[in-house]
């Protein structure tokens, strides 16, 4: 069933807000990563043997992992808005059935219905 235009506008606004928040978070993290890179470039920093704190390399790895997750979130949010604009939001990308309101409420960027998501997850294991 097609989505009500008012509901679609509300959802698009919510997705746009999440996208803006995620972009802002990614920009802040990029600034922190750049600062950490400058710290790592400082040849006098021997933090690997400092018992007081986290080594720069460990912090870099952690932050890079967070940035990777933010990048995935950005792509998922952009794709959800594209599906919404094209009229395919809420339809499973694999089987075409409706995704289900509860799943979309919990995960607005979901591309797969719960059955297809479970099958995809079991194949990855």
Regions found by a protein language model. Name each.
Residues 102-107, 123-125:
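Short Cys/His-rich "knuckle" micro-motifs
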Residues 109-119:
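Cysteine-rich micro-motifs
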Residues 1-86, 124-125:
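Interaction interfaces in information-processing and related assembly proteins
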Residues 99, 120:
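Cys/His-rich microdomains that often coordinate metals
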Residues 94-95, 115:
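Short, cysteine/histidine-rich loop/knuckle motifs that typically chelate Zn2+
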Residues 89-90, 110:
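Residues immediately within or flanking Cys/His clusters that coordinate Zn2+
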